[in-house]
């Protein structure tokens, strides 16, 4: 009936008037159920338009930029006190999940969706995972679901790399001591970075910073650099991978903070570990030992401090990020792609 009426209808003002009159009469003739149904459909349509409008793509957000920050004094930080609007620890980026999902789709198109279930789930429900995590563990960029959780890992979690690092303890220590001779009271030697702390001084000498090699520093420590290339589980191709020498001066306290992800294990090889130095992860304190590796999940709330005297000298560790042992090979490849530096 309606189809015949539309075909026969004259496209004119008179026809428009007749159309409106017919529509009003049709509504009057309808029973209450039909009117309610139409009203519900109209509400659903309006809600859908609003929802689609809210999810229009945000401006491009580089994953790498979310991990970087500079404080008010221009000192690179990476943990706290950063005031950069691009720092993930200081601001929330609504566009990040969309960017990650786009990267995952691009990876799956090139390779395969096989084995991507946890990553897909993690990206899709990232906001819920991060907001529902207990306050003791809150990775600030990416949470991979269904990974075993513990503040500290046993040494055999990455046995090969731990043993290799410990066998090369003396070589790394010698290269550090050669570097440290350049320190003076008035200037920071080239290649070193100072990090913001509420008290004391914290310096790092980067070999890999957020997945990017630092060639000038690597050339100064060739044996340490070659050692990094021999590690089987070193994260070197995405923004969650770092390797450096970390120095805490006496009297230094690092503010409690969370790392960006739970897909990695942070490994500290003790180079110089005077008394009064401690690492606290998830409320559990541990002490470093020279020539020994300490493995922990830095997505837990953690801090470090050096309460020794000036005569004790600095606390020095060689730090490197290793893959969490329960992240599968296919997932590692995909995460390297999704979180590639500069992507």
UniProtKB/Swiss-Prot annotation:
Membrane topology: Single-pass type II membrane protein
Keyword Chloroplast assigned: no
E.C. code: 1.14.11.-
GO cellular component: membrane
Spans traversing the lipid bilayer: 32-52
Binding residues for 2-oxoglutarate: 202, 246, 266-268, 315
Predominant place of localization: membrane
Residues that bind Fe cation: 257, 302
Molecular-function GO term, any one: metal ion binding
Pfam family, one: Asp_Arg_Hydrox
Gene3D superfamilies: B-lactam Antibiotic, Isopenicillin N Synthase, Chain
Enzyme class, broadest EC rank: oxidoreductase
Swiss-Prot/TrEMBL keywords: Dioxygenase, Glycoprotein, Iron, Membrane, Metal-binding, Oxidoreductase, Signal-anchor, Transmembrane, Transmembrane helix
Cofactor(s) listed: Fe cation
Lumenal topological intervals: 53-343
Ranges facing Cytoplasmic side: 1-31
Subcellular location: Membrane
UniProt-annotated glycosylation sites, renumbered to this chain: 77, 185
InterPro entries listed in its UniProt record: Asp/Arg/Pro-Hydrxlase, Asp/Asn_beta-hydroxylase, IPNS-like_sf
PANTHER family to which the protein is assigned, alphabetical: ASPARTATE BETA-HYDROXYLASE DOMAIN-CONTAINING PROTEIN 2
Function: May function as 2-oxoglutarate-dependent dioxygenase.
Entry's family note: Belongs to the aspartyl/asparaginyl beta-hydroxylase family.
Protein name: Aspartate beta-hydroxylase domain-containing protein 2
Organism: Rattus norvegicus
Organism lineage: Eukaryota, Metazoa, Chordata, Craniata, Vertebrata
């Amino acid at each position: 009936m309606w189809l015949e009426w539309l075909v026969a209808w004259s496209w004119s003002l008179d026809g428009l008037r007749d159309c409106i009159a017919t529509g009003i009469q049709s509504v009057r003739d309808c029973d209450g159920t039909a009117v309610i149904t139409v009203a519900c459909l109209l509400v659903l349509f309006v809600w859908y338009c609003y929802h689609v409008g809210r999810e229009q793509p945000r401006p491009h957000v580089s994953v790498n930029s979310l991990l970087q920050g500079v404080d008010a004094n221009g000192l690179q930080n990476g943990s706290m006190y950063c005031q950069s609007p691009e720092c993930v620890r200081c601001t929330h980026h609504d566009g990040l999940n969309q960017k990650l999902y786009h990267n995952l789709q691009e990876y799956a198109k090139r390779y395969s969706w096989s084995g991507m279930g946890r990553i897909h789930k993690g990206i899709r429900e990232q906001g819920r995972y991060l907001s529902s995590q207990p306050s003791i563990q809150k990775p600030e960029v990416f949470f991979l679901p269904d990974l075993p959780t513990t503040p500290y890992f046993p040494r055999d979690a990455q046995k090969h790399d731990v043993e290799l690092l410990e066998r090369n303890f003396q070589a790394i220590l010698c290269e550090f001591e050669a570097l440290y001779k350049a320190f003076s009271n008035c200037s920071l030697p080239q290649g070193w970075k100072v990090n913001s702390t509420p008290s004391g001084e914290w310096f790092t000498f980067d070999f890999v910073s957020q997945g990017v090699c630092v060639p000038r520093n690597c050339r100064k420590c060739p044996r340490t650099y070659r050692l990094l290339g021999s590690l089987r589980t070193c994260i070197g191709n995405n923004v969650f991978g770092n390797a450096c020498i970390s120095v805490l001066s006496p009297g230094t306290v690092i503010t409690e903070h969370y790392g960006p992800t739970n897909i990695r294990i942070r490994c500290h090889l003790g180079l110089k570990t005077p008394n009064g130095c401690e690492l606290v992860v998830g409320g559990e304190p541990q002490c470093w030992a020279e020539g020994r590796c300490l493995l922990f999940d830095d997505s837990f709330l953690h801090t470090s401090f050096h309460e020794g005297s000036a005569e004790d000298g600095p606390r020095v560790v060689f730090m490197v990020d290793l893959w969490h042992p329960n992240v599968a090979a296919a997932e590692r490849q995909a995460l390297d792609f999704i979180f590639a530096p500069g992507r």
